[in-house]
Amino acid sequence: MNRYDETMKVIFLDIDGVLNSSKTVDRNFDYPELDPRNFAVLQKIVNKTGAVLVLISSWKDDWLNEDGTVSRSQEMIRYQLNQFGLDIYDHTADMTYNRGEGIINWLNVHAAESWCVLDDEIFPDYEQLQIVEKLVKTSYMDGLTDDCVNEVILKLMG
């Protein structure tokens, strides 16, 4: 999509504390780092809103191996997303400490009708760049749960 596709709805997606939680490692899933239950909640949101997923997580830092091949991190995330009919549309180009700046820079290139951020943390630049009002804060204890669904839908469809 390009700068002029203003009908796009975007979910800026963190992984840790959103698609997994502090309890995830204790479970016996295909990929213990990721929780299918959190993915099922994300699927509900995407099905209702038609939003695309833009990765903001530090997991994107090793998205590709040094030789340009797909990393295990990318493989795990995409595999699990694909199980729910989802995929990553794009990712931001920032360092972890300036995650909000990465979101704003992405939006400057890819206009969106609406957007929200799914993250379990509030980064300092979220407040500086007024991203907090677009944030749906998850809990690292549980990740993305049904309790978040209506808030995300409201921010995207509002």
Where is each model-derived feature located?
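Active-site neighborhood of HAD-like aspartate-dependent phosphohydrolases
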Residues: 2-50
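Short His-Asn-centered micro-motif
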Residues: 13, 56-59, 118-120
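Short catalytic/ligand-binding loop motif for oxyanion handling, primarily in non-cytosolic enzymes
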Residues: 20-21, 62-66, 124-127, 145
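C-terminal cap/substrate-recognition subdomain and adjoining C-terminal extension
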Residues: 75-158
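Substrate-recognition element of Asp-dependent hydrolases with the DxDx(T/V) motif
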Residues: 46-69
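Short, flexible/disordered intra-domain loops and linkers
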Residues: 26-33, 63-72
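Short amphipathic alpha-helical segments
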Residues: 24-25, 47, 67-68, 128-130
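Structural motif
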Residues: 10, 52, 114-116
